[in-house]
Curated annotation (Swiss-Prot):
PANTHER family: GAMMA-SECRETASE SUBUNIT PEN-2
Disulfide bonds: none
InterPro entries named among the record's database cross-references: Gamma_Secretase_Asp_P_PEN2 (IPR019379)
Gene (UniProt): psenen
Principal subcellular localization: endoplasmic reticulum
Protein name per UniProt: Probable gamma-secretase subunit PEN-2
Keyword Cell division attached: no
Length: 97
């Protein structure tokens, strides 16, 4: 467990933590959804159905967002030079060369 109090989490506290992490993940922070899933792994045998719902959709959100992001990164890295000025315009940093 992460902290000694974790052994004493009741269902209401678990639901509250899972819900907060799930909502925080919507602010373009999909890694928070992953943390939500990893945090509750030790409790997986005793989870409430509501917590399982948040964890299931955290996993779906994390995988979906990561797939879209990695797909975009692949397309961008392969085609940036072909796009010319547009490829440079959408860059955060413009590489030299």
């Amino acid at each position: 467990m992460l902290i000694p109090e974790d052994d004493k989490l009741d269902d209401e506290k678990m639901i509250n933590i899972a819900k907060k992490l799930w909502f925080i993940g919507f602010f373009f922070l999909p890694w928070v959804w992953l943390i939500n899933i990893l945090y509750f792994i030790p409790y997986r045998n005793s989870l409430n159905d509501k917590v399982k719902w948040y964890l299931k959709f955290s996993l779906i959100g994390f995988l979906g967002y990561s797939t879209i992001f990695m797909g975009w990164m692949g397309i961008y890295l392969v085609n940036r030079n072909k796009w010319g000025a547009f490829g440079d315009d959408i860059s955060i940093t413009i590489p030299f060369g």
